[in-house]
Structures are given as structure tokens and as C-alpha cells.
Amino acid sequence: MEKLVERFLKYISFETTSDESSDTCPSNPKEFELARYLEKEMKDLGLKDVYLSENCYLYATLPGTDKNKKTIGFISHMDTSPDMSGKNVNPRIIENYDGKDIKLNEEFVTSLKDFSFLKDLKGHDIIVTDGTSLLGADDKAGIAIIMTAIENLMKSNEKYGDIKIAFTPDEEIGRGADLFDVERFAADFAYTVDGGAEGEFEYENFNAASAKISIQGKNVHSGSAKNAMVNSILIAMELNSLLPADQRPEHTEGREGFFHLNDFNGNVEYSQMYYIIRDHSFEKFEEKKKFLEEAVKFLNIKYDNRIKLEIKDQYYNMKEKILPHMEIVDLALESMEKAGVKSEIIATRGGTDGSQLSYKGLPCPNLFTGGYNYHGRYELVSITTMKKAVKTVENIGKIGVEK
């Protein structure tokens, strides 16, 4: 088995699901298990300055052979999404995929009808799940790509500048860059390897916020509830109905933003709703937050102040921080071309650690991994594309940017 695939399969065997309800960093102590494994692997490879922080940020350096080039960083995250279990991942390799529906198990099928991109993967070697968990390509494919590219550079006779590597916790819950030590990392610029389809390159992302809504009802015996009971579930339903139905993830694409109710729990007495708010336009992002605030205000008048709203900005569109440094965009595009990859600049409908790091003074656009259908049982990754991503990362190091 190729080292790239071997690495990936090993990394996804670690359960590293981040936990939004936790106040610790990392949010799940199991993230340390993968971090310690990677720490040892880095040391065994001979990387320098290997350091694992108390908050599960892992850093390392590949010393350069050309001191006239700027220092480049590569970053991926170790956690997987809490949207689905990342425990006991049972991957299956499909060689020379035929481009048809993929039966995951007796109940679930990754179908061409639902996922038209599958036709583009015909002839690829791919890795899929057994339908009981996510795969973890987001972003353990990125980790495997970086580690393999670094090892290849070390074994080559090529010239490259200093290269920094970092693997972070809790990206999936919007905290991956919170405690990232930009000074320790000491790169002039960096790339997250956390994208999707072959050739996709992203330096524009959503502005993002989370919203937590708490609704206090009044539970009274249903037989004597007239003019007394206040059902918090019904208030929650009413609140959701006030938001634009056409501004939901399932009805939007491209640069269209949305409100997404991604969790709800409640009973008559008490309910909680959790939304994420997204838009590429900062103006429209602010309008969406204001709209939700006004909806809550309206219902608080109607229901005697029973609703509490907490909105927290998570990250912002990195575009304005990348535009002054377009040489790093040009470097990525040239490196893809040399790897035989047709590049496509897209506005990602998500966020990466790089979006926050760009606002901390580390310009950090996003490279592809070959992963698809993140955060669920239909997640898959193309080994064929991962290999091209490895070549792209190697080329970035080799070409570099002169000081």
C-alpha cells in the first residue's frame, strides 16, 4: 500500500470528533491521541522544532535548502465534524471506480442522482465509508497530503525554503485558529490543505456567526392549560417560520448566504435552537444577524420576553487580507499547473482556519484535498486527486517566493 494511503487510513482510525458544548481546548481530549501520533511521526522523519502545545496545536519545521526563499506554511486540522460519528470508521477502497452508484450498506447508497460529481471520478481510486460514520477526509486527507509531500521533499535533491507545518484542533467548531501561535509558526504566508475537488483554490470564504436561542415556556397540565400553558416548542417553530425559507442551505449556492437551523432540543417548558449564519458579503452578513435579532424582538413582545438570543461571530471572509498578497495565489496556481491540475478559483461555502489566521497577519488561502460530501456518511476521497495535491504542495515548496 502506498505511504499516502497508509497514512490516511491510520489517521482516520483515531476518533477526533470536536465537541461544541465543551469549553476546553481541545474540545475532545481524544484529539491529543492523533496529535501525539503525529508528533512521533514528525520526529521520526527528522523534522525540527517539533512542538505539541498544551492545547493540542502541533508545530514542526522542515529546514530549507535555499535561504533566499520566503518561509511557507502548510496547515490542516485534526478534528472531525460533530455532525456525524467519527468513531470506528470502516473505510473501503474502490480501485478504478466505474462511475456508478456506490452501495455503502444495505440501507445507504451514494448515488449519481444525488451526487452528480461522481461521474468525474470514473477511473479514480477512491475511499468511501461503510455508511455508519463519516470518513474523516476533512481534514485527515490534508494531514496525509502534507506529511507525504514533506517526506518527499526531504528525500529529494530539490531546493526549497524553510517550510512550517501545523496541525490544529477544533476547526470544525470554529475554534481552530483561536490559540494558534502565529509567532511560533513564523511563516511569511501559509496554505490550509482543507479544500475539496481537484484544482479548487479558495481565498474567499463565508463570513460566519453562530446563534443560540433559549426559549422559556410554561408547562401546565394539558387538561387545565387554557390561557396558562406557553409551549416553547411552538414559539421555536414560529421563530423559524419568520426566517426567509429561500435562505436555507438546501436552497442556496455560490455566493448566496443562509440561515441554518442545525440543532434543536426542547419540550413544552424549555427549548433551545442553534443556528449558523453565513454570507460572503459582509453587508448581507450583518443584515442577516439584524434580521434574526428583529425576529426575536418581535416574538418577545408577543410572548412577554421569553426568548434569549446570543450571537457570536466565528470568522470573516479572508479575501481582503489575501488581495495585497496575490503572489501567493499565483504560486499556488503555477504549482497546480506543474502538477497537471487544472485550477479553479472558487468562493468556498464554508470556512477554514486560514480565514481567521489571515486576520491574525498570516495570509492563508486554501488548497484542494480530493474530498467530497464532508460531515456525513456519504463522505469520500479520491486517492488519485490526493496524489496530485501532494505534487502541488511539493511544487509550492520547490518554486517558492524570493525574499
What are these regions (language model features)?
Residues D23-K69, G73-D79:
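A non-catalytic alpha/beta surface segment that caps or lines the substrate-entry region
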Residues L118, H124-L134, D170-E293, K297, ...:
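Midchain, well-structured core segments that form catalytic/ion-binding scaffolds
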Residues E151-I173, G254:
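Short helix-loop-beta-strand segments that form the rim/entrance of peptidase-like active sites
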